A protein has these predicted regions:
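Membrane-anchoring hydrophobic helices of lipid-metabolizing enzymes
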Residues: 2-129, 169, 306-318
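Catalytic core of membrane glycerolipid acyltransferases/transacylases, capturing the structured
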Residues: 121-182, 207-210
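Non-catalytic C-terminal accessory region of glycerolipid acyltransferases
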Residues: 2-3, 11, 49, 79, ...
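A conditional alpha-helix N-cap/helix-loop micro-motif detector
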Residues: 105-109, 160, 178-182, 218-219, ...
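Short amphipathic
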Residues: 107-112, 252-260, 440-441
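Catalytic machinery of carbohydrate-active enzymes
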Residues: 53, 70-72, 82, 120-121, ...
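Residue-level signal for inorganic ion chemistry
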Residues: 61, 229, 288, 347, ...
Length: 622
């Protein structure tokens, strides 16, 4: 506490402390109403000249009031809140130096009698305080409760040691003990044991807290009130203590909102903290404009799913109303984009409130809409307009953007959505706009492309080994054998027609030709030449014809990747892409890989006299 030897102050810090003393001297001679008017004027200036803060408040208003707010109605709420908040903040400085007479004129206590009874006779009251109104009042009203043995509050020490000493003395002058979180919790727990009142600002974001809903959206919440309550061993009471503005220079200090903890919740930190959040939310809803919404209460941090245990997940499932919204802008090549599936499944599994919003080329959209881990899928054609449509807007603000695509135009549109955290690869041409840059894994031998995306996920969450293959999604009764002679990668990956004829003859009947509808004309012609049925499918319907009991003989491309997705066994010829990097994921596949010195070439058409796979025989494939 202040009794400790403070670090030596710098010249700048000393100057700041002198300026603060002068400021307080001026405040002493001003009436609280004058300070409030001055605060409102400053509030209008803050609103007018700080667009960044306006955006933060607008985001928070959509969370605490209505996620569908937009336009003039949202702007009006933002203005009112910024003006009110600045007024309240200005008045907190005056509150610390007000006389008892001035305080009595400005503050009305609600529930003070029951509050004092609870805090007397060895009982402990933990006052859970939101950042709302003029919360400095709660430190000043200590003399009004003579029966309370000890009266204290948690606070964050200032970096300026001179200013810290001044503020500390002003806060303790009237008998309120101040406990710094930097000094540990020993004195706090001693107060809890001896009895009294302890105030804790309970609505601050903390990465080390429990991740549970507040106003229906998950955020890191301090479990300190719950910890202190449990330490009281039955002699503790939790209340939501808040202040709200009722007029120019006037506030109510509400001390009557007791938080009842059920027997089923008493042993769970997450459950007790959830009850605290619910009570604070109810208290703040009585005057939502008084809330301090000019900071990011619902932050998106690099690690957004750390140590979320089953108790927290239970509270999330029970109380979450607004999801944690992740935008994933996938690669434009379908064959590459589909390899992000394990990455997506990892993200979706890390927290119950995760919502994945996929931004993709139009030809991919229908496929992503069929995936149960995907919330919404929009196209790269005006994605901002789609993501802000009424259907998607109602789920609240976006939190995080994984920019995997290298489409700069799309990236600029997505930045306009103001995601709080943007992440991607360090070798992306868009890396200047990416906050968290992941280095692709580099080993002694080439690694599968899936591992790149899992490495990106591991930068933010703990991986749980989510698979690429989900055989339950395929056609369980299908036992067909298919050939897939057309590659979505281009003619460089095609195999000679004579060899397909030989393969069909050696498979001895029951073989069908499988192709994407984009290759309909070529597929029907070749199927007629081979004398076998032709089955056409789309990426989004491939699971209807393929299943874990099917076998596919194919050239590299999208179809073998779709087949592997549902557990179909694949025999694949690869030439323009490295097999170690792009082979169909899963077990039981056979890959035959050939390349000449000029390859892998990644060309749509081969410019060589003889393609790489020309020497692959039917025996090799079988």
């Amino acid at each position: 506490m202040a009794a400790d030897v403070p670090p030596k102050a710098t010249l700048t810090q000393k100057a700041g402390a002198i300026a603060y003393r002068i400021f307080c001297a001026i405040l002493r001679i001003l009436d609280i109403k004058v300070v409030a008017i001055f605060g409102r004027v400053i509030g209008y200036l803050v609103w007018a000249f700080m667009p960044g803060r306006r955006k933060i408040v607008a985001r928070n208003m959509r969370i605490v009031v209505d996620p569908t707010l937009r336009g003039r109605k949202l702007s009006a709420l933002v203005r009112r809140n910024m003006v009110r908040t600045t007024m309240n903040m200005a008045c907190t400085f005056k509150t610390g130096i007000m006389t008892e007479k001035e305080l009595q004129k400005s503050v009305t206590l609600i529930g003070s009698e029951s509050f004092e009874e609870m805090a007397a006779n060895g009982q402990t009251v933990i006052g859970c305080i939101p950042h709302a109104g003029n919360w400095e009042i709660l430190a000043r009203i200590r003399p009004l409760f003579p029966k309370v043995k000890r009266y204290g509050s948690m606070y964050r020490r200032l970096d300026n040691p001179v200013l810290e000493d001044i503020v500390y003395k002003s806060r303790t002058k009237f008998g309120c003990e101040m406990f710094s979180s930097k000094k540990g919790l020993k004195e706090v727990f001693r107060l809890a044991k001896e009895g009294g009142m302890l105030g804790v600002l309970s609505d601050q974001f903390t990465q080390q807290g429990v991740f549970i809903p507040y106003f229906g959206k998950v955020t890191g919440t301090t479990p300190l009130p719950a910890l202190i309550y449990k330490r009281c061993r039955g002699n503790g009471h939790l209340i939501a203590a808040n202040t709200r503005n009722t007029g120019l220079g006037k506030w109510d200090a509400v001390l009557s909102n007791q938080i009842k903890i059920s027997d089923s919740s008493a042993d769970s930190l997450a459950a007790i903290t959830m009850e605290v959040n619910n009570a604070l939310e109810a208290a703040q809803r009585e005057s939502i404009i008084d809330g301090f919404w000019m900071h990011h209460r619902w932050k998106a941090t690099r690690e957004f799913a750390t140590n979320i245990d089953d108790e927290q997940k239970e509270q999330i499932r029970k109380y979450c109303k607004l999801p944690y919204r992740i935008i994933i802008c996938v690669p434009e090549e379908f064959e590459e984009a589909i390899l992000t599936i394990p990455f997506m499944r990892e993200l979706r599994a890390c927290r119950p409130d995760i919502q994945l919003n996929i931004v993709c080329p139009e030809e991919q959209q229908a496929f992503w809409k069929t995936q149960d881990y995907v919330g919404h899928a929009v196209t790269t054609n005006k994605p901002l307009q789609q993501l802000e449509s009424d259907e998607l807007y109602k789920d609240g603000p976006y939190d995080m953007l994984f920019m995997i695509s290298e489409n700069g135009k799309v990236f600029r549109e997505l930045q306009a959505l103001l995601p709080l955290y943007i992440t991607g690869f360090d070798d992306s041409p868009l890396r200047k706009g990416i906050r968290a840059k992941c280095v692709r894994p580099i080993g002694d031998t080439p690694e599968h492309k899936i591992n790149d995306y899992l490495a990106l996920a591991s930068e933010h969450i703990t991986l749980t080994k989510q698979p690429y293959v989900d055989s339950s999604k395929g056609n369980q009764s299908a036992t067909n054998r298919y050939i897939a002679p057309f590659s979505s990668l281009g003619t460089a990956d095609c195999w000679q027609t004579e060899k397909w004829k030989e393969l069909v003859s050696r498979l001895e009947g029951g073989v069908q030709l499988l192709a994407l509808e984009a290759d309909k004309e070529k597929a029907t012609s070749l199927a007629a030449e081979l004398g076998i049925p032709c089955v056409l499918t789309k990426p989004e319907t491939a699971a209807e014809v393929l299943g874990p009991q099917c076998t596919l003989y194919a050239v590299d491309g999208l179809l073998p990747q779709l087949a592997a997705l549902v557990g179909c066994r694949c025999h694949v010829i690869m030439s323009s892409r490295l097999a170690a990097v792009y082979a169909p994921p899963g077990d039981g596949h056979k890959v035959v890989y050939r390349h000449s010195p000029c390859h892998p070439c990644y060309r749509n058409s081969c410019d060589q006299a003889s393609p790489c796979n020309a020497d692959i025989s039917v025996d090799d494939l079988l």
